[in-house]
Design a protein with these regions (language model features):
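Acidic (Asp/Glu)-rich catalytic clusters
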Residues: 55-59, 81-88, 110, 114-121, ...
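Internal, glycine-rich beta/alpha segment that forms the wall or movable "lid"
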Residues: 12, 16-19, 33-41, 105-218, ...
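C-terminal helical cap(s) of enzyme catalytic domains, especially alpha/beta-barrels
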Residues: 142-146, 150-159, 233-242, 337-358
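Active-site pocket-lining/capping segments in soluble small-molecule metabolic enzymes
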Residues: 10-26, 31, 262-311
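Alpha-helix-loop-beta-strand connector modules within alpha/beta enzyme cores
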Residues: 76-94, 346-360
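Hydrophobic faces of well-ordered beta-strands that scaffold small-molecule active sites
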Residues: 4-8, 64-67, 90-96, 121-125, ...
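Catalytic domains of carbohydrate-active enzymes, especially glycoside hydrolases
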Residues: 48-68, 214-224, 322-328
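N-terminal beta1-alpha1-beta2 module of alpha/beta enzyme domains
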Residues: 1-87, 199-200
Length: 366
């Protein structure tokens, strides 16, 4: 079965490219209603609209959602906790960086969230952050040391975690010891209600050699993005290095999408957004960034955090998603999120994964 995750918004949502024009989630300027049915202020809070996105994800049948780390957006841990409380089935991945806190503290928070959610919390560790963001947080770890710290972080977090239940024992731990360059733990380990829980599934990202090495050792899932040089070489290297350690790592591909009933309708949406983002027309024609197989390299000019994604009819986008080799699933996103989630759930996911998402497919594999 193909896994599908959806990346949640972190700074509000809406149909426009300019964030100040998007009023969902309380980030843009308030806009007067054209039809006044209820003028009472405060009837809909800023988090209610994000809650609707999360609810749409559950209804649409995606397997999980991701609360991204965003220094200027909503706190990902709070969003993830709210999503776990609101849902019953979807997995929820919280993205955070190792400087967020000690690995023991992150593990303890996660243990409580696993109790709350019947084990649906996952982690996406963001090892590399923008240098300006790191300085603003007082984080002085740079370069390859970031991966060394992440290695220690995940080692300690797993070390204090006990998958089997351990009876309470006063204030003592379970004897876990660790002495590293970034963390030191003496008599660590969880007991009582913090034990006997599944450790969060660990997602890691990046195409660099350091990223692949870290994922081969610690990752359960690795998320790639499409680049001009592709992801296939890194994916094969990851599989080989994980196998050397007796492990396997699932591979996901992160992609923004614009999918509609017809290809022309999808491109009409792109061109409306392009004209808004480039009203002077000096940036050229949006179709000049079209690539083969429904790929388009202009998503970063429309406010997304990566350039390459997919545009086309539902059939075209599904065909391209199905063609990616060495990939076990996808992290999709699109704006506005509520509408795009419902489109994906109703028209796209079953085309990519008929065996897992249609009755006929499930009966054929029974």
């Amino acid at each position: 079965m193909t896994d599908f995750y959806w990346e949640l918004p972190s700074r509000g949502d809406g149909r426009r490219v300019a964030s100040e024009l998007n009023t969902r989630g309380g980030f843009g300027a308030d806009r007067p209603a054209t039809v006044a049915t209820d003028l009472r202020p405060g009837k809909l809070g800023p988090f209610d609209e994000l809650a609707q996105v999360i609810h749409a994800a559950e209804l649409s049948g995606v397997d999980g959602v991701i609360a991204p780390y965003d220094p200027s957006g909503e706190e990902s841990w709070v969003v993830a906790a709210a999503a776990l409380r609101q849902t019953r089935h979807v997995r929820v991945a919280v993205e955070f960086h190792p400087a967020f806190g000690t690995p023991v503290y992150a593990a303890k928070m996660s243990a409580t969230l696993q109790r709350l959610s019947s084990g649906r919390l996952e982690w996406r560790l963001k090892v590399e952050t923008d240098p300006a963001d790191a300085r603003a947080r007082g984080d002085q770890v740079t370069g390859r040391d970031r991966y060394a710290r992440a290695d220690e972080f995940l080692t300690v977090a797993r070390g204090v975690w006990n998958d089997s239940e351990v009876l309470p024992g006063g204030f003592g731990g379970t004897g876990y010891e660790f002495a590293g360059n970034h963390y030191d733990v003496i008599d660590g380990g969880f007991r009582g209600i913090l034990s006997g829980l599944p450790f969060p599934v660990v997602h890691l990202t990046g195409n660099s050699d350091e990223a692949v090495t870290l994922s081969a050792k610690h990752g359960d899932v690795h998320q790639f993005v499409l680049t001009d040089t592709g992801y296939e070489t890194s994916a094969r290297t990851l599989a080989d290095r994980a196998l050397e350690q007796g492990r396997s790592v699932r591979k996901l591909l992160r992609l923004p999408i614009i999918a509609r009933e017809t290809t022309d309708e999808a491109w009409a949406r792109v061109e409306r957004l392009w004209r808004e983002a480039h009203p002077d027309g000096v940036s050229g024609d949006s179709r000049a960034l079209a690539r083969e197989n429904s790929q388009w390299s202009g998503f970063d000019r429309l406010g997304y955090d990566q350039p390459i994604g997919l545009i086309g009819s539902y059939e075209d986008v599904a065909r391209e998603l199905s063609s990616f080799r060495h990939i076990d699933g996808f992290v999709l996103t699109g704006r506005p999120h509520i509408e795009e989630l419902h489109r994906a759930g109703e028209h796209l996911l079953h085309l990519v994964d008929p065996a897992g998402r249609t009755l006929a497919g499930q009966e054929a594999h029974a």
